[in-house]
Amino acid sequence: MYYLALNPAVQSKLQEELDEALGRESDPIASSEIVKRLPYLGAVINEALRLYSLSSMGLPRIVPEGGVQVSGKFFPEGTVLSVPSYTIHRDPEIWGNDVEAFRPERWLEQDQAGIQKTFNPFSYGPRSVTIKIRNCFAEGSNQIDSC
């Protein structure tokens, strides 16, 4: 909601998508089937979670037997490696030069398979939790301008 308040154009675009989807239904509460078909809602939620993940820590992994080479550096077996989500979510090579900007459109412009590999706002299981957030948002906030 913070980013929607700061970005009236994003708020308007999202409100249009919600109005269009919910305007066709007799029930003002969106079903999960409707929510799945709201790409801009998903982009807004993902972009907010990219910038402010609920978990900033990465998932630690132990280097297997024989060690591993990562970006030209060797790590011996038993070494614990982890990359914080904060760092991954702000990599300009993945997200573009405007990495610090709240820009949901990046989720609609870029290769979804590629960015999903690096999008990890909850340390694990991002898709299932993101779907729950989308459902809660659509069910409880179909009037964005009143938030």
What are the residue ranges of the model-derived segments?
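Cytochrome P450 I-helix active-site segment
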Residues: 3-55, 71, 76-79, 101, ...
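Cytochrome P450 heme-thiolate "Cys pocket" and heme-binding signature region
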Residues: 28-33, 71, 82, 89, ...
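Conserved cytochrome P450 K-helix/beta-meander segment immediately N-terminal to the heme-binding cysteine loop
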Residues: 12, 83-111
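Short acidic-hydrophobic surface loop/beta-edge motif
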Residues: 66-70
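Short, structured beta-strand/loop micro-motifs enriched in basic residues and often containing a Trp
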Residues: 59-65
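A generic "cationic amphipathic patch" detector
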Residues: 27, 61, 91-96, 115
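Cytochrome P450 catalytic-core helices
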Residues: 1-17, 132-147
